[in-house]
A protein has these predicted regions:
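Membrane-interface segments of envelope glycosyltransferases acting on lipid-linked substrates or membrane lipids
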Residues: 1-121
């Protein structure tokens, strides 16, 4: 199984730490791990021999960049044959939703905090 996580920045928060932990847990359990992020301080700790890393401006809420990101994410999904896409924030969730609709892959998203539960994502 190939799992790609998409997170705006790899800082030191809860979602970021969860992304880092899952990214390093997956290869130990016969899964391949991929991360798309725009950067962040945790990048230097990613074990690049275990996790494939891509840099895209997925932190942006600009509608044009969301569409462009979805195109790039679609190509990554198809080229690496990604099984599951996990978005860890609202901005990249829109790009991932479009990409997974186009590529017909599984899509999951998580959030923590107070958001409107009537949202389609």
């Amino acid at each position: 199984m190939k799992v790609m996580q998409v997170i705006p920045k790899l800082g030191y928060g809860g979602a970021e730490t969860g992304c880092y932990d899952l990214a390093h847990y997956l290869p130990e359990n016969n899964c391949q791990s991929y991360i798309i992020t725009s950067g962040g301080p945790l990048l230097k700790y990613i074990k690049k021999d275990k996790v494939k890393l891509f840099r895209l401006p997925v932190h942006s809420k600009n509608p044009l960049l969301i569409i462009l990101n979805s195109i790039f994410i679609s190509f990554i999904i198809l080229f690496f044959n990604i099984s599951i896409v996990h978005a860890r924030s609202r901005a990249p969730a829109w790009s991932c939703l479009l990409a997974t609709k186009f590529t017909r892959r599984k899509f999951v998203t998580t959030f923590h905090g107070t958001y409107n539960f009537n949202n389609s994502i």
